[in-house]
């Protein structure tokens, strides 16, 4: 008989199955047959406990296999349960410590039996955050493991007890968090000596990990106390008593502590994780939980720290009326990513971010302006009227003329030898999705010097308003591969029009689209806010637009507003304060919510926004390489400078899946297949980023906004 073991007494073919009732801390042995179903086993167990209580939230958990027995009609034989099996009868909802994007720690009851996608959805609903598919949960990883990266070696020993820092990889597999092997010494050399935090002891934190310190006197399993663990600033744990995490928020009654986050600054006494290179930036994407598996299946247990973060940088319909919590939490995550140098940005941009942050802080207690008395129906009718007017205008434009830009610009091809001669001047024309250029305007009827389709190109900016520098950087797909092309504009107005056209063309839209003029105005507004950043090199036109400087608060701390990289470069803190004060003059009319939204828009305009780095090894390759997943593409990058070497568009992708046996991600494109093994993060993480962005790209205001969870898991599940 399959269930017979030595020493086990058999009565009528029955055998004893031990089950631990966790919340009562008692163990019961139930006499069972292999054909008993899971539901019947729970009924017998409850009867054996002889305790009057509500057991509806309890389920059976199999610790050795790390899975819930959720199919109540399946039998013990079907589940592979024998007399040697140890089961637990435990509540599905348990207490967890959730760190929000603004670094606040809250205690919440979370369902540990459903997949993390559902758990995130419920948590976001309770917090008042719409579009939960943009967020995800992340495990706490000890900082020393975060610095070192993950092992390249497979764990061939089968399932083991999961410890802090370990990540589950597909069904019944595990990978340990260990240093990259010696074969990856080239990566280790890039790390060594480049991060000031690497040689220091204590907890390392960044915008994704910062503030994950436990309450005073408690630490996660396997984590030792350190000098920074009980730092006064970092152990702040604001609990919002007015929020009941078992009930949803109704009637827009959002908690003020979630809309206006408490003040928190990086402490000089606590070492911080500021990524110094692309290997360290790749480490930030470790720890994302598998959306299709439950928390306990991934080694998250009661009382553990879980990080809630915006994962996908594609934000749908940010509305101040419905999203005060969502806007603030997104703003806070953006703020910390800027302060801790997760995104490269210029000094001018840093000053603008500081000015917007200052305005949001100063306006914190000021009431938002009263909205008009229009109800929701009137507002929707107004939006519909505007959309119909724009559509009608577009149709008229299509019948009469196709929008076109034509102007003299300067250009450069950085990878050509001619680049040493600097920029050349030519006459450019932009029509539909195509960019052409001639020697002069009189040559437009002859063959162009160059003709490119901008659909699917990569567009980034290199702008300094103070220095009158307006560069548009294009990475263009051609038959010979990707080529770099830089356009140099002469003025803000010219730059705004051409940059807007390039951005829309990269998304497959022409200037006839109704969003073109909005894009132009958005770029102009951003340039206008940067125009008062106190740069001495600015011309008289820029200087004349500066508003009067504001007097900074007495408790103004530059470390709370400016990245330490630029604080160190400044001659003095007074110089930084003066620049922030000057820049603030251009944003002082904004409300707190408007300042946060402008901060988010400026953050989204950064070249690295929406790019997630991973260290991988391509099939049959010897050395590791840098890969980036973006909103609409996958790219292979130079690991030293981040320069794009090759790009694969999601639009050209036919199929992708994970081979769990060798932990490879295989992607089939129209013209080639690629296969690689992620080294810096779990292979499921990379797969979810690709499938998740494809899922988010399907959202539109014209379609129902009901969350299609089945489609999400189809795109992110990892199975062929």
UniProtKB/Swiss-Prot annotation:
Q: Which GO terms describe its cellular component?
A: cell-substrate junction; cytoplasm; M band; plasma membrane; striated muscle dense body
Where is the major localization of this protein?
membrane
What membrane topology was assigned to this protein in its record? Peripheral membrane protein
Q: In which tissues is this gene expressed?
A: Mainly expressed in muscle cells in both embryos and adults.
Q: Which GO terms describe its biological process?
A: cell-matrix adhesion; establishment of protein localization to organelle; integrin-mediated signaling pathway; locomotion; mitochondrion organization; muscle cell cellular homeostasis; muscle organ development; positive regulation of locomotion
* PH domain sequence ranges: 402-507
Provide the GO MF annotations for this entry. cell adhesion molecule binding; integrin binding; protein-macromolecule adaptor activity
Q: What does this protein do?
A: Component of an integrin containing attachment complex, which is required for muscle development and maintenance. Probable regulator of cell-extracellular matrix adhesion. Required during initial muscle assembly to form dense bodies and M-lines.
PANTHER family in alphabetical order: FERMITIN 2-RELATED
Protein's name in the database: Protein unc-112
**What is the organism field in this record?**
Caenorhabditis elegans
